Design a protein with these regions (language model features):
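Structured, solvent-exposed acidic/aromatic patches
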Residues: 3-193
């Protein structure tokens, strides 16, 4: 949420300094002093980037079922060794939850925002090179630009491909999307009075 707040509310103050938003990294009670100064734009970008680093360290790069224990990512092997248990939390049913690739894509958007001429200032050291490097890490997931479909930008016109999307799987060009649903009344059916 800090990214969207930063995008909507950052800008130059009357003294010419480039300001971001208040950085709140802990619970704030109703009786707290909300009259706090805004952080600089760069401090906000750095804070969001640190949050994304922590997310990437904890999350899998992608979710999906596995069949053997050696497919469990190394960072989770001290927690779980049974593939069936891993699949409950990190398998196909977890697709469309935030994952490491989504964190990488948000970093790419963040650095693109930070490099924008709208936010250029001596205090903001982020450049187009930072944005390009972050975007390259996202493209590495599909083995670079060559891994993208040559007709990917028109996937939405391919009814067969759309009809075959299930269990949260995505075409190569889509990182995160709403699950395809043929009925939106599941909640109502399950919770009928």
């Amino acid at each position: 949420h800090h990214y969207f707040l930063l995008r909507a509310h950052s800008g130059f103050a009357t003294d010419g300094s480039l300001l971001g938003i208040m950085i709140l990294n802990k619970f704030v009670g109703a009786d707290a002093d909300f009259n706090q100064p805004r952080a600089t734009f760069k401090e906000c970008v750095d804070s969001i980037n640190a949050d994304l680093d922590r997310a990437e360290a904890l999350l899998p790069n992608d979710y999906g079922n596995i069949t053997t224990a050696d497919q469990i990512p190394a960072k989770y092997r001290s927690i779980v060794t049974n593939p069936d248990l891993y699949n409950i939390a990190m398998g196909n049913k977890a697709r469309q939850l935030v994952n490491g690739l989504i964190a990488k894509s948000f970093r790419s958007r963040l650095f693109l925002l930070a490099a924008s001429p709208a936010f250029q200032d001596a205090s903001n050291t982020y450049t187009w090179a930072n944005a390009a490097d972050a975007a390259a890490k996202v493209l590495d997931y599909v083995n670079g630009p060559a891994g993208l479909s040559s007709t990917g930008v028109t996937f939405y016109t391919n009814d067969t491909e759309i009809g075959n999307i299930k269990e949260g799987s995505n075409p190569a060009e889509i990182i995160w999307r709403e699950n395809l649903a043929t009925s939106n009344s599941d909640q109502e059916s399950s919770n009928y009075p």
